[in-house]
Amino acid sequence: MRKTIVIHVDGLTGRSFPELGNQTLLQSARTPYLDHLACHGELGRLGVPRELRRFSGEMALLAFLGYDPHKWYTGPGPFEGVSMEVVLDAHDVAYLCHLVTLRGEDGWGDGKKLGSQLFMADPFGGGVDTEDARELIDTINEQLVSENIQFYMGHHHRHLMVWVGGSSKVVCRNPQEALGQPIDTYLPTGDGAQIVRELMEASRPILCHHPVNQERLNGGLKPANCLWLWGPGKPVELPPLKERWPGKGTVISPDGPYVGVGTTAGLQTVKVENAGEGDIAWLQALAKMTSTALETQDLVCVHVPFYAWLMIDEQAQPPTTLVEYLERVDEHVIGALEQSCTAKGSHRLMVMCTPFPHQQEDGAAAMSPFLVFEGENGNPEHPHLTFSEQEAANRPLRDATKLFERFTADK
């Protein structure tokens, strides 16, 4: 069976930058390994026909594994629950429950009411660590838990809320969308939204006056002073991948919902720690982990969450810095794994790049370019081809849900 590596660079495409001459990051960065693979492989663009939700994150992995998101993707919440080993009943609704930092016009805004007077200062709760978060979530559980509402401890700012028999029709927004903005237009709406808002508002006085946050303020840190509930969904039971494919596979990612998709499909999973600011050592370790896993696995999907590096300490990273991060990914992940595939001779390498899931996109930049490298094929037909959104735009849209079937049919 031919072995396959899938590298998913998530949150890379999505916009062009005036500072880069209105080019995208892929156009501006020096990416010799990606360009070489594009010249010697198949270049195209991925998506799911008739799917209006953005093709990125765990939904992109779900589609690649051959599961139609129209049928199987209800939201990130239940897959986060799987990664946390939380057992959900059929009528439960799982919400991502993030600790965030809200700021008022004259301070941190101690008032309970959520509205236009509060701004999203930090969607990551001021970088709260897991030890502090545990004390905060424990207190939330003591005061807000009920027969129908349950909170589960995760890591850092990321946790889970389960609404037993609740509504999955609430329209929620990722807190990253609201960064630096008044939160009123980002609050939950729709059927059941009032209950979700009330829980978020009830968390405010509990967290604002918690000793952990008082210590954080005294130490010059931002308080994790509100729960933000989003990403609701009911649990899904995916048909096991082994019913369609006899091989063994592994998913490697720092992202809970992404890992949850792999687990639900019956793959092995490795959840790694997040890396700050495109850390080279982390990227090198990720490539080594992938190469090692392929020694015993037939498929390894490795997730590079580029979106996590777009904002650092409430500030958008300069485009030139993002270009540097992309060049690191090209060298230390894609280049390293290309060399590994070439050394083995018969391995397949796929790279897919998807848009940042929570920002306004523009034109061709919003698409998801991909390439498949089956090995050197002599002199390429297009020796000067580069891997970019603009090059992929000239190719027809490929249905992501059909790729896995194609790969597994090729022995």
Question: How should each PLM-predicted stretch be described?
Answer:
Residues M1-K411:
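Feature captures the catalytic ectodomains and active-site-proximal regions of enzymes
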